Amino acid sequence: GLIYEGKYILPYCPRCSTVLSNHELAQGYKDRNDPAVTVRFKVTKAPAAISDADMENGNTYFLAWTTTPWTLPSNEGLCMGPDVDYVKIKDKESGDFYILAKARLASYFKNETDYEIVYEKKGKDFIGAKYEPLFPYFEDLKDAAKCSEISGQKCEDGAFRMFNADYVTTDDGTGIVHIAPSFGEEDSKVFK
């Protein structure tokens, strides 16, 4: 029982043709400015904890933020902070509904007269909500059995759903982050 087979995400150096340890990555680390993007993900199924028929009408979106936009084609999930306060708002101009962290609302909607708050919930209430994939590459992962078969991980509810993780904050972005398990150690752990 001391040895098991599993998968682990490691950085790879194309120059050296080998994987790198976290220690090697930390050497010579420099802060730098990376591009960040906010993407809207169309909600297709409301979570069990929230009674919201409008959520499935095609005009409700999660606003997710990422500093790794090149990983968006591999998106398989979204993540909220379990104890963070989130709001569903109605954009008065477009009529669309958006879900994001309450603490980040003023960063995205500067004028309070441009929106109306529909309700406020904790991140843990959104677990299990489903959304439409950005790209068709991994649509098979919607199905739980296919997701488990392809990823080699236990996917009880399939991909393209809401998860919770304590590392999600409201310091930047929308309070919702995108998950690409193939590209990040934290993302991979959340998806397991």
PLM segments and residue spans:
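NTP-handling and nucleic-acid-processing catalytic cores
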Residues: L2-K192
